[in-house]
A protein has these predicted regions:
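Extended catalytic core of nucleotide-activated donor transferases of GT-like folds
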Residues: 11-98
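Donor nucleotide-sugar binding/catalytic pocket of nucleotide-sugar-dependent glycosyltransferases
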Residues: 86-144
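Conserved catalytic-core segment of nucleotide-activated headgroup transferases in glycan assembly
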Residues: 130-243
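Acidic donor-binding loop of glycosyltransferase active sites
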Residues: 246-264, 274-277
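Short hydrophobic beta-strand element within catalytic cores of glycosyltransferases
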Residues: 278-281, 297-298
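A charged, aromatic-enriched C-terminal amphipathic alpha-helix characteristic of glycosyltransferases
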Residues: 321-329, 339-370
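C-terminal alpha-helical cap of glycosyltransferases
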Residues: 340, 361-403
């Protein structure tokens, strides 16, 4: 394939993901278009943006999206998907949300129903694979991480990784506030409690953002100020993929945890399972594709209405639902993992083995090829015509000159 890449903005995310010394990143960088111009119409366009921005510019157009983290995508997103020839979702949950929803089409003047808006184009699912060369069991810990973890006195820590987004207590998408409260409640007033590490941030890694994270932690902590509470540590700042893996594997990290309300896929949880340590989480939305119920410390959950504060107005819907864990059971499971850790270790190793086989970059590449190749096979290709060579002209007869008579 002759691949060209057009970089697109994603909110306030800085364009600093590519590392100059990384050979894979170098291959990406040299394919980025410096000017948004192409010499001809491309055969295939893979558009990886939010669906209302999908644009068909090629002979075959494929939209790729994680969808939205609740059950009702916006109508404009469904319209965007219908502009494409195929739509690829990152999980069965996100695909199902698009397939099930229908909207009434209203006349702008009369407001009468003119028809139904629904997803009409073909769909497929392509998971977000993890790099098995990076995410794996390791004992290697960088000096930077070693210094950070040296400040943690506990030898048993639960680790959460994810953004702390908007919303009141219990309403942020990752449900970090309630996870904190459950942790404090379950292990308060104990002599040797475990710790909780939050690798989190809001919009970035600034000092202002770090202070905002501390303010949120203290808001929950202060509501329980009469108790002796276990320690919660904030790990704030940018880590490389290798450092993220080292963090997952640090000997003080004994288990991964998430109360997430909704995921389009949940790749940080997938990458964390590659460390071979227990994962405590609901098997509910996007992560249900790779969290095996036999190997996960599964938190019971139910589908509940999404609070209005959790999403921007354009993405919210009063009928939308997401997952909410049973907080009482979640606390008991955390306590059991802490008190009976050995019984969970073998299952965690099995989950690691299964996920490394099924959800690697290589497996993702094979699945993408299975999806894309049939589409490309039907694209008309220019054919070079080979005309037959012409025979040489016969030699002209030289007639004798007539003598003048």
């Amino acid at each position: 394939y002759d691949v060209r890449i057009q970089s697109v903005r994603w909110g306030s995310t800085p364009p600093n993901a590519l590392e100059k010394d990384n050979p894979i990143h170098q291959e990406i960088d040299k394919r980025i278009l410096r000017q948004p111009n192409l010499e001809k119409q491309p055969d295939l366009h893979l558009h990886i943006v939010i669906p209302n921005e999908f644009q068909p510019i090629a002979k075959v157009n494929v939209g790729m999206t994680a969808g939205i983290e609740h059950t009702i995508p916006p109508a404009s997103w469904v319209e965007g998907c219908n502009r494409m020839d195929l739509n690829i979702f990152t999980s069965e949950f996100s695909r199902t949300s698009f397939q099930k929803i229908q909207f009434d089409k209203l006349d702008n003047k009369t407001k009468k129903v003119q028809g139904i808006l629904k997803l009409e184009k073909p769909t497929d699912v392509l998971f977000e694979g993890a790099d098995t060369n990076v995410y794996k069991e390791t004992k290697e810990i960088s000096e930077k991480l070693s210094q950070k973890f040296s400040k943690i006195k506990e030898d048993f820590c639960f680790l959460f990784v994810g953004h702390w987004l908007t919303g009141n207590l219990g309403e942020d998408r990752k449900d970090i506030g309630m996870m904190l409260k459950v942790f404090y409640t379950m292990f308060k007033n104990q002599k040797n409690p475990p710790a909780l590490i939050l690798k989190t941030s809001g919009a970035g890694f600034s000092i202002i953002d770090r202070n905002e994270m501390m303010k949120k932690i203290n808001l929950v902590k202060d509501s329980m100020k009469d108790d002796k509470l276990p320690n919660v540590y904030l790990l704030h700042g940018d880590l490389s993929d290798e450092e993220m893996n080292q963090m997952y594997n640090h000997p003080k990290v004994k288990a991964h945890i998430s109360f997430t309300h909704g995921e389009g896929f949940g790749r940080p949880m997938l990458e964390a399972t590659f460390s071979g340590k227990p994962m405590i989480a609901p098997i509910s939305t996007g992560q249900a594709d790779f969290l095996n119920k036999e190997y996960t410390v599964q938190i019971p959950h139910q589908m509940t209405k999404v609070p209005a504060s959790a999403f921007p107005k354009d993405y919210a819907n009063p009928e939308a639902e997401w997952s909410t864990v049973n907080y009482g059971m979640a606390g008991k499971l955390m306590e059991d993992v802490y008190n009976n850790y050995d019984k969970y270790k073998l299952k965690a190793k099995k989950q690691m083995i299964v996920n490394r086989e099924l959800f690697s970059h290589e497996s993702m590449k094979q699945k993408l090829d299975e999806i894309i190749s049939p589409l490309l096979a039907n694209i008309p290709q220019p054919v070079e015509l080979k005309l037959p060579s012409l025979k040489k002209e016969p030699k002209k007869l030289k007639l004798p000159k007539l003598k003048k008579g």
